Regions:
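Cell-envelope/extracellular polymer assembly enzymes that use nucleotide-activated donors
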Residues: 2-4, 31
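Active-site beta-to-alpha loop of glycosyltransferases that engages the nucleotide-sugar donor
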Residues: 7-21, 38
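Acidic helix N-cap motif at the loop->helix transition within catalytic regions
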Residues: 14-18, 41-50
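Short, acidic, metal-binding catalytic loop of nucleotide-sugar glycosyltransferases
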Residues: 21-30
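Short beta-strand/loop segment that forms part of the nucleotide-sugar
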Residues: 29-39, 61-62, 91
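A conserved acidic beta->alpha catalytic loop
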Residues: 36-45, 95
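Conserved donor nucleotide-binding strand/loop of the catalytic core
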Residues: 44-83
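Short beta-strand-to-loop acidic/aromatic patch adjacent to the donor-nucleotide binding site
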Residues: 85-96
Length: 99
């Protein structure tokens, strides 16, 4: 059963490693897709460096500019459905709610 968590980001360098560790630490075989809206703080670079730590489980889509949270989720849902994921979850990177 393929499960994926979509995490939109914009300037989340302070949170991204912690939220990814929390999601992967749940031991639920989740895959994670980060949708980054061109964060100038290097959020996408942090995620790209972590991809090798979670091969085949962590993915990133980089968008040009800040296109908004809603469109980031829609982008992620379309990506996940095209890849055949059966369960799609969403979470904010800022820990506004626990994973």
């Amino acid at each position: 059963m393929e499960k994926i968590v979509i995490i939109p980001t914009y300037n989340e360098k302070e949170n991204i490693e912690n939220i990814l560790s929390a999601v992967f630490g749940m031991n639920q075989d989740f895959h994670v897709l980060v949708i980054d809206d061109g964060s100038p703080d290097g959020t996408a670079d942090i995620v790209k460096n972590l991809v090798s730590k979670f091969p085949g489980q962590l993915f990133i889509e980089e968008r040009k500019g800040k296109l908004g949270l809603g469109t980031a989720y829609i982008h992620g849902f379309k990506w996940a459905l095209a890849k055949g994921y059966q369960f799609i979850f969403e979470i904010d990177a800022d820990f506004s709610h626990n994973p």
